[in-house]
């Protein structure tokens, strides 16, 4: 092997920082980079110069959009940090980063505790089995409540989370933390930007409380660790090392979540949380074997981090970098790869050459000769690779599980101002859809109008802004429209028969198809139940294809038909006149004929909406949610305000920000997250069909 790895695998951590928007995640990441010596000047998100937020749009909006991958060093460990966005419109970025992480730090706002997007990212982390520690940030804020934040983890996430620290003071008096494992106090020097603190005995006024909390921590660990339980019940002393080892084991098994306190903005507590990353989060050697598939045999193959095994990596993000052009972020699972060598893109079965390999720091980069298992790096030169592709040793192809991409829920029309803008827009849309699989662009063949769709208004705003800024496209943007869907609610059988005789060769296709509703989210499923060759083998794929094409345009109002099973069970053919095209048309006719019997309905996206308002405006806010066809899910108190949880159709949420602002004198805030699709009420369905007039035949 030409090069040696710089850090052993056991001393490597691949982590993500996850949070609700505004919980202080970017500031926390900044501080990590500052204390690990990667940056020399601290950037503040709210002043727009944070190191991690490297796209112009992020600098302007003060939110994190793209998961920049950064390498840092703490003590003698390498920590690769993937900065994930906290805004719900960028959920795919969070999914992508979780897919390649080994562990995560969940950042909470000490005043708010668990918020809606925290629930979302926590659930995603559960899906991918990512161990987490929690950092309760903003302890310097008025209303900061560490204990309430820990409680919210239990109540809202059902998480077995326990404090391994206790804050000293809060709001203006927050000056440090008490370590409940080593039973010492870390008190910060205000003048040293957090780079200096004193570890001292626990101040007398906190001793009793600290002893009580350590006892509670030991009890909580005993519940998930038999060895600690035995010692605890036997009244034996439990050493700090034993306690730490038990917490590590339980955290790696997703049975325990250690909680830290701090204020990234005020430079307190970040280093102790970094110690937590090392102490409790996994190295690539600690995670479960990674399951891949052999494309030749279909067999499952388990991958463990090992430099000697054949190379296998996942491309988890494509970015257009101003300096190097197309940059592919990869996570290496096994083996190693030198720059200049060839890899097989096993997902597309094509060879690609990796020109250069880069180690990324927020917005600068270092060229490296080789990457090893467990590494996260940027590759230049991969022309055909897209998000979710598997890159492997050409002699050992493997398919790693790809990413689940959610469907967009909102769309707008984009009209270029001139012919030159049209050409630039085509290039821009191709690049942007490559980078972000939840962003789609399509042109209506009849009207020539281009529609872009995405995960929310902010998502589309940012994409349009990027078209203007990066590709110099001047375009007119239409009103946002809801991405409705259609589905069947009843079983229906129908025949589709297409016969055309007009001199010369005719056309003949005849099918009987049984349509049944599928489970929500299962999509379209096709079953071939033909017996005795009544529809010849070679025409069956055409029936499947004909159905899929027809479903794109729905049966009621031109919206895609989803979650339907189709079983082809009978039909007939003509020796001479039958063709693939004829069976395609026959299938689409069967779908059309089934529509009236299958209880077709239009589905609309329902958003989970959380509104925070001062109590005096509660009546108005609740009235306005009800008026928007919202259903209440519950209410809670938070820092002197009321928090209303509800479900509201997306179509009713346009312009809500303005309504809320005026009805609460600018003091109310809201967040919304896509939750599920639901049938529209009959009157609204009729309106939609009428508006789309003519598209539904």
From Swiss-Prot:
Start and end residues of each tr-type G domain: 10-285
Gene3D superfamilies (UniProt xref): 3.30.230.10, 3.30.70.240, Elongation Factor G (Translational Gtpase), domain 3 (3.30.70.870), P-loop containing nucleotide triphosphate hydrolases (3.40.50.300), Translation factors (2.40.30.10)
Binding-site list for GTP: 19-26, 83-87, 137-140
Residues making up the signal peptide according to the UniProt record: none
Cellular localisation: Cytoplasm
A single GO cellular-component term on record: cytoplasm
GO molecular function: GTP binding; GTPase activity; translation elongation factor activity
Alphabetical UniProt keywords: Cytoplasm, Elongation factor, GTP-binding, Nucleotide-binding, Protein biosynthesis
Any one biological process term the GO annotation gives: ribosome disassembly
InterPro entries to which the protein is assigned, alphabetical: EF-G-like_DII, EFG_II, EFG_III, EFG_III/V, EFG_IV, EFG_V, EFG_V-like, G_TR_CS
Annotated NCBIfam families: EF-G (TIGR00484), PRK12740.1-3 (NF009379), PRK12740.1-5 (NF009381), small_GTP (TIGR00231)
Biological role: Catalyzes the GTP-dependent ribosomal translocation step during translation elongation. During this step, the ribosome changes from the pre-translocational (PRE) to the post-translocational (POST) state as the newly formed A-site-bound peptidyl-tRNA and P-site-bound deacylated tRNA move to the P and E sites, respectively. Catalyzes the coordinated movement of the two tRNA molecules, the mRNA and conformational changes in the ribosome.
Family: Belongs to the TRAFAC class translation factor GTPase superfamily. Classic translation factor GTPase family. EF-G/EF-2 subfamily.
Designated name of the protein: Elongation factor G
Organism: Lactobacillus helveticus (strain DPC 4571)
Classification lineage: Bacteria, Bacillati, Bacillota, Bacilli, Lactobacillales
């Amino acid at each position: 092997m030409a090069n040696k790895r710089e850090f052993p695998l056991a001393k490597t951590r691949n982590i993500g920082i996850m949070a609700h928007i505004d919980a202080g995640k970017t500031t926390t990441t900044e501080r990590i980079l500052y204390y690990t010596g990667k940056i020399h000047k601290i950037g503040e998100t709210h002043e727009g110069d944070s190191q991690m937020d490297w796209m112009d749009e992020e600098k302007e909006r003060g939110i994190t959009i793209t998961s920049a991958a950064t390498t840092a060093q703490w003590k003698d460990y390498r920590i690769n940090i993937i900065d994930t966005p906290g805004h719900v419109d960028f959920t795919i970025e969070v999914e992508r980063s979780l897919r390649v992480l080994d562990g995560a730090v969940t950042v909470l706002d000490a005043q708010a505790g668990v918020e809606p997007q925290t629930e979302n990212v926590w659930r995603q982390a559960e899906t991918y089995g990512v161990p987490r520690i929690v950092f309760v940030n903003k302890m310097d804020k008025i209303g900061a409540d560490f204990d309430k934040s820990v409680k919210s983890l239990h109540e809202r996430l059902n998480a077995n989370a326990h404090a391994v620290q206790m804050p000293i003071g809060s709001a203006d008096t927050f000056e440090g933390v008490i370590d409940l494992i080593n039973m010492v106090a870390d008190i910060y020097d205000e003048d040293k930007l957090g780079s200096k603190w004193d570890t001292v005995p626990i101040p007398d006024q906190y001793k009793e409380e600290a002893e009580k909390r350590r006892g509670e921590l030991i009890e909580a660990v005993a519940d998930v660790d038999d060895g600690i339980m035995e010692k605890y019940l036997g009244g034996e002393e439990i050493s700090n090392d034993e306690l730490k080892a038990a917490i590590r084991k339980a955290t790696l098994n997703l049975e325990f979540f250690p909680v830290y306190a701090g204020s990234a903005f005020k430079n307190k507590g970040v280093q102790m949380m970094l110690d937590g990353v090392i102490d409790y989060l996994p190295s690539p050697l600690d995670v479960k074997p990674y399951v891949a598939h052999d494309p030749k045999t279909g067999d499952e193959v388990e991958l463990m981090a090992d430099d000697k095994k054949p190379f296998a990596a996942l491309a988890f993000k494509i970015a257009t970098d101003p300096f190097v052009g197309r940059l592919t972020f990869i996570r290496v699972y096994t083996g190693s790869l030198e720059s200049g060598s060839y890899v097989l893109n096993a997902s597309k079965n094509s060879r690609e050459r990796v020109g250069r390999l880069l180690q990324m720091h927020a917005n600068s980069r270092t060229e490296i000769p080789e990457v090893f298992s467990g590494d996260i790096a940027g590759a230049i030169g991969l022309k055909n690779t897209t998000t979710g592709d598997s890159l492997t040793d050409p002699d050992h192809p493997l398919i790693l599980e790809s990413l689940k991409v959610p469907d967009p829920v909102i769309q707008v029309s984009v009209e270029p101002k001139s012919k030159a803008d049209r050409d630039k827009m085509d290039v821009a849309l191709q690049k942007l859809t490559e980078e972000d699989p939840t962003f789609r662009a399509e042109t209506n063949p009849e009207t020539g109008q281009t529609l872009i769709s995405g995960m929310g208004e902010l998502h589309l705003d940012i994409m349009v802004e990027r078209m203007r800024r990066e590709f110099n496209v001047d375009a007119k943007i239409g009103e946002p429209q809801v991405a409705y869907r259609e589905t069947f609610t009843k079983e229906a059988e129908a025949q589709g028969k297409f016969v055309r005789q007009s001199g010369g060769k005719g056309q003949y296709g005849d099918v009987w198809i049984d349509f049944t509703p599928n489970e929500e989210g299962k999509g379209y499923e096709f079953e071939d139940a033909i017996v005795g060759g009544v529809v010849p083998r070679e025409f069956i794929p055409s029936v499947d294809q004909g159905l899929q094409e027809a479903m794109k345009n729905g049966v009621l109002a031109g919206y895609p038909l989803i979650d339907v099973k189709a079983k082809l069970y009978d039909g007939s053919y003509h020796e001479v006149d039958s063709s693939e095209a004829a069976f395609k048309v026959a299938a689409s006719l069967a779908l059309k004929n089934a529509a009236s019997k299958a209880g077709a309905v239009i589905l609309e996206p329902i958003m989970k909406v959380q509104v925070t308002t001062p109590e005096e405006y509660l009546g108005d806010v609740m009235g306005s949610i009800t008026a928007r066809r919202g259903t209440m899910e519950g209410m809670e108190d938070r820092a002197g305000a009321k928090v209303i949880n509800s479900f509201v159709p997306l179509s009713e949420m346009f312009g809500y920000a303005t309504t809320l602002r005026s009805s609460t004198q600018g003091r109310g805030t809201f967040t919304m997250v896509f939750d599920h699709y639901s049938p529209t009420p009959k009157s609204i369905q009729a309106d939609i069909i009428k508006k789309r007039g003519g598209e539904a035949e």
